[in-house]
Structures are given as C-alpha cells and as structure tokens.
Amino acid sequence: MKNQYLHIKTKELNFKAKLLWDDAPETCEAILKILPLTGKLMQTRWSGFGVWIDLGEVEIDEVPFENHSIYLAKGEIMFYPGFESMKEIVIPYDKVAFASKAGLHPANHFATIEDSSDISELGRRVIEEGLQPVIFDIK
C-alpha cells in the first residue's frame, strides 16, 4: 500500500497523488473506503487558493487529526474530518490557510499530487466556469 495513488479526473485534467500512508494511515484508509467518489469541485470560500468537494452526504469513517496542518501548499491534498463543520476534501492550487467563518482549522494532509503543473489551470476553471465535475479513484 505504500505506493498507492489517488487518481483525480476532471473534464480534461487528470492528476495523480501519492497517498501518505506513513503520515496519515487512518485518513488514507477512510478515503479508500469511499472510492470511487464523484462530485463537484468548487472554489474555497475562506481558505485562499484551493478547490474543495463537500462530503456531507458521504458515509465516511471518523478519523483523528494526523499529519494535520492549517497551511498547505499547491498540490497537498487535505481531508477535513468535520469537527467544526462539514467534512470535505481540499486541493490547493496555490497557498491555502484552511478556514471557515469560525476561523482557522487544522486538516489532515493525506496525499500529494506528483505533477502539479496543471493544478493552477484547475483553479482558473473553477473560478471562471464554476463547479467542475470530478472523480476520485484508485487505479
């Protein structure tokens, strides 16, 4: 399982993210159980330069904070377990300080996109075109 990859597919953009089993094992396990996951990516409201998918209707295991941070860089995928608000996955396309209207929140960094050269384009599309369909899966 050490070299497992999360595949993220939008309309025309595809990303491959290495799961961080050594740093966030419970989060990786919980995410695997909900795959394949389809939904819509939207622009973050409070956090900066990122897109996110709401997991509100998805049955996902409770996980502790692990490998958690408030600040993430381009391509560092995080899972917010929903302790203060809804559960979500966030993909930064630049710097993110994960927050809600209640303030800053730590989230679990569980995967990192290997080639993030197109991630800024994903951010641009979400801003200019609106919601983007997405599929998360393991191949």
Segments predicted by a language model, with ranges:
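Glycine-rich active-site loops that engage anionic ligands at enzyme catalytic sites
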Residues: 19-139
